[in-house]
Amino acid sequence: HELTNKFSKDSRIIQNTFEKISLQNKNEHMNFDKLLHLIDDNNDDTIFEMINKLMIGNYYESINLLKNFERINFSSSSILYLIKSKFKLLQKCINMRENGLTKNEIVNNKSLNIFYKEHSLFFKMLDFWTLSKIDECLYFLFKTELNCKSKKEYDYIFLNQLFLYIYFKIKIKP
């Protein structure tokens, strides 16, 4: 019964689910929990978790999540769009900080729609990021997007490079 509830009514999602199951290593033991994880068609939380980890410098955790998306052949364009959106939101936050607002005032600003559970992450991001670093990362992201579209078979290699670039922007102090 639990498996039935997890399946979507959308036939494309069901087809994707069967593809994910067939891509699993044949020698690997498949238990019920692993099967539930594979057929769970709601990857949104994991994507946001991956991007948040990346944006606060947890490269290894974010890259492991990225590998999971590569295994299920998740759209690189969707990942890039969400990273770009996070950078744009962070730009707004930094501009507000430069206009004299405190971190608390920024994360509680209704126009930004920052979820309460993300407040501590944004506090960290505001410590790590500057407008110039974001601009440099957005430029690299746009180049990555072009590469992913023109050389689709290498899209996850380009995403890996982008993740490394973002990580080094956070960790290397000018």
Language model features with spans:
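Helix-rich C-terminal "collar"/helical-bundle subdomain used as an assembly and partner-interaction module
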Residues: N58-P174
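Long, charge-dense, solvent-exposed interaction surfaces that engage phosphate-rich ligands
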Residues: H1-E49, K53
